[in-house]
């Protein structure tokens, strides 16, 4: 869905490789230990996946005027993916979802051990903010980098993604006592928060890296308005994405999903299928998909209007909006 995913993959691995090289000069870790750590830390990244969040960051940024292959943009997108991957490694642990399969491969704790998987997740989360701290070296304005740190840390922190997981655990094994409002709150926190941040980081990077930034985004209130629209888009995508996930978990097998199917039902988790039935959940996913595309159109109107006024709306920008529309549509009507 994104023709330049290979560039992102390179940044994901190269960042950890650079950290390994830096650590090699400190004489506290042997070459064998460094290689072992590097293998462990890159394992969940190399498993692949949809790369939904970093692709959203890149596509939103391009729609806001950023060059497609700008190093600072790729660094920001990689930071988003590190945070997401860390959350998956921790979610799969026996004390959480206790899953053996992720992205079609054995989960990290099955390969390296439970305690080691905990450390792998910790390492990826820490590395994400190390990347953002260095983003200015790649051409991102320091104020934009700082705001990216603020948004990502809040979305992934105690009152964002972590709160969602906490709330999810509280209702696991007690799903009958919960309702639709509770489910939406879990999905908004656990999934929507980081997707919202991914879109917001795209706006911040895109507006900062655009060659027409001074003309298009000179009014700070304008950027804030675009930022809010992007966050609303990400939150709506998150809820739709998770409901689609609930339907797929109930209707597909493990090979089709690349992860263990039927786990939600086995663990008595609160899901859209449990509350609405398979058909009802599918209808709700369709409604939210349409709502997400409306949110995207709102974001486009806010941004493209400013770009047109500054004569910076061109064929590249138009293509980026089209790619973003296609990406979101394919994401929310997926079958695996």
Predicted feature descriptions by range:
Residues 1-336:
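All-alpha prenyltransferase/terpene-synthase fold signal
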């Amino acid at each position: 869905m994104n023709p330049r995913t290979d560039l992102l993959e390179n940044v994901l691995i190269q960042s950890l490789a650079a950290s390994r090289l830096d650590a090699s000069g400190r004489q506290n870790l042997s070459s064998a230990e460094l290689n072992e750590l590097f293998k462990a830390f890159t394992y969940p990244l190399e498993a692949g996946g949809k790369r939904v969040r970093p692709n959203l960051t890149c596509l939103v940024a391009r729609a806001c005027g950023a060059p497609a292959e700008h190093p600072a943009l790729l660094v920001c997108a990689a930071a988003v993916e590190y945070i997401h991957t860390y959350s998956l490694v921790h979610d799969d642990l026996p004390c959480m979802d206790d899953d053996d399969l992720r992205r079609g491969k054995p989960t990290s704790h099955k390969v390296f051990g439970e305690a080691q998987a905990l450390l792998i997740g910790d390492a990826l989360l820490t590395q994400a903010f190390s990347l953002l701290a260095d983003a200015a070296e790649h051409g991102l304005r320091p104020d934009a980098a700082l705001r990216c740190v603020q948004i990502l840390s809040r979305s992934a922190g105690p009152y964002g993604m972590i709160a969602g997981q906490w709330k999810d655990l509280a209702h696991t094994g007690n799903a009958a006592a919960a309702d639709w409002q509770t489910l939406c709150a879990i999905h908004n926190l656990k999934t929507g928060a980081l997707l919202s941040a991914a879109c917001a980081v795209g706006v911040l990077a895109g507006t900062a890296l655009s060659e027409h930034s001074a003309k298009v985004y000179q009014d700070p209130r304008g950027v804030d308005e675009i930022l809010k629209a992007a966050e609303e888009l990400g939150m709506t995508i998150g809820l739709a994405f998770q409901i689609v996930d609930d339907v797929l978990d109930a209707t597909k097998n493990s090979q089709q999903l690349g992860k263990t199917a039927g786990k939600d039902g086995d663990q008595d988790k609160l899901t859209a299928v449990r509350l609405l039935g398979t058909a009802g959940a599918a209808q709700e996913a369709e409604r939210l998909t349409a709502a997400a595309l409306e949110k995207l159109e709102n974001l486009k109107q806010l941004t493209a209007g400013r770009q047109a006024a500054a004569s910076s709306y061109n064929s590249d920008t138009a293509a980026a909006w089209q790619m973003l529309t296609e990406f979101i549509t394919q994401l929310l009507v997926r079958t695996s």
